[in-house]
From Swiss-Prot:
Cofactor note: Binds 1 [2Fe-2S] cluster.
Reactions listed under catalytic activity: a ubiquinone + n Na(+)(in) + NADH + H(+) = a ubiquinol + n Na(+)(out) + NAD(+)
NCBIfam families per the UniProt record, alphabetical: nqrF (TIGR01941)
Domain spans labelled FAD-binding FR-type: 58-198
Protein name: Na(+)-translocating NADH-quinone reductase subunit F
Name of the coding gene: nqrF
Length: 303
């Protein structure tokens, strides 16, 4: 607990002093005003707390797995079907929490596309097992946008043990998610979030890499497909090699249909078979060198 910093509450009385696990998320001024992380506050006495109104709109759903497909070597796209007649009233950039029961999964049972199995074998990951004795809760950003109704779509990267140290624990939730198959039942709750677009005419610059694609896709699709925004916007995405890129056709289509949108990919480790003649390096450096360095007013952009 205490790693994501999303469960902020205002504690007006009780709760004790702020813990070291909270100090990375809460500064001294906020702590003085009573800001705490709910997951770190032990209830040992009567307390007075204040939570945001939107928390009371949180619901729980039992969903069914539609598909759980590889999009990159270590990234899956999990699609969940919301129960008939119900909806998750989320905003682009929002997230849900997903529950994993106690489980024992073997990586050798994962459904991994043939084109990616070589890397899994090379690192010995098919020998990994994940054994979890308690329920687990984790937050994931939606990759779909509000008009893609009836589903929740997530981009999930597997948290494997480091190569050569396979005795270390694997990611509890990502291992569970990678084990899911069509028809399985999954419990989620939400919606949550604060990473929402501001309603201005300012230029938008989206930056992401790997499974960080999820909120970027949600935002960009929402701006261009639902809101039909005319704001200038660009998406800068970083991947290791060409095989780690995904949703290219979607973004190429958006760029072709919207003069105000461009997207750029930089590969940090292009392979010989990629025949890559595009941008290379880490995406934050590429963004600065290729665009922001000569931008007339980068401080006016929304990132």
């Amino acid at each position: 607990g205490g790693s994501c910093g999303q469960c902020r509450v205002e504690v007006h009385s009780g709760g004790g002093d702020i813990l070291p696990t909270e100090e990375g998320h809460i500064n001294k001024r906020e702590a003085k005003s009573g800001c705490r992380l709910a997951c770190q506050v032990a209830v040992k006495q009567d307390m007075e707390i204040e939570v945001e109104d939107e928390i009371f709109g949180v619901q729980q759903w039992e969903c069914e797995v539609i598909s759980n497909d590889n999009k990159a070597t270590f990234i899956k796209e999990l699609k969940l079907q919301i129960p008939n007649g119900e909806s998750v009233p989320f905003k682009a950039g929002g997230y849900i929490q997903i529950e994993a029961p106690a489980h024992h999964v073997k990586y050798s049972d994962f459904e991994i596309d043939e084109q990616y199995r070589g890397d899994w074998k090379h690192f010995g990951f098919f020998d990994v097992e994940s054994k979890v004795d308690t329920d687990t809760l984790r937050a994931y950003s939606m990759a779909n946008y509000p008009e893609e109704e009836g589903i929740i779509m997530l981009n999930v990267r597997i948290a494997t043990p480091p190569p050569g140290r396979l005795h270390l624990p694997a990611g509890k939730m990502s291992s569970y998610i990678f084990s899911l198959k069509a028809g399985d039942k999954v419990t989620i709750s939400g919606p949550f979030g604060e990473f929402f677009a501001k309603e201005t005419d300012n230029e938008m610059v989206f930056i992401g890499g790997g499974a960080g694609m999820a909120p970027m896709r949600s935002h960009i699709f929402d701006q261009l497909k639902r809101l039909h925004s005319k704001r200038k916007m660009s998406f800068w995405y970083g991947a290791r090699s060409k095989r780690e890129m995904f949703y290219e056709d979607d973004y190429n289509g958006l760029a072709a249909d919207n003069d105000n949108f461009q997207w750029h990919v930089a590969l940090s480790d292009p392979q010989p078979e990629d025949n890559w003649d595009g941008l290379t390096g880490f995406i934050h450096n590429v963004l600065f060198e290729e665009y922001l360095k000569d931008h007339e007013a980068p401080e006016d952009c929304e990132y």
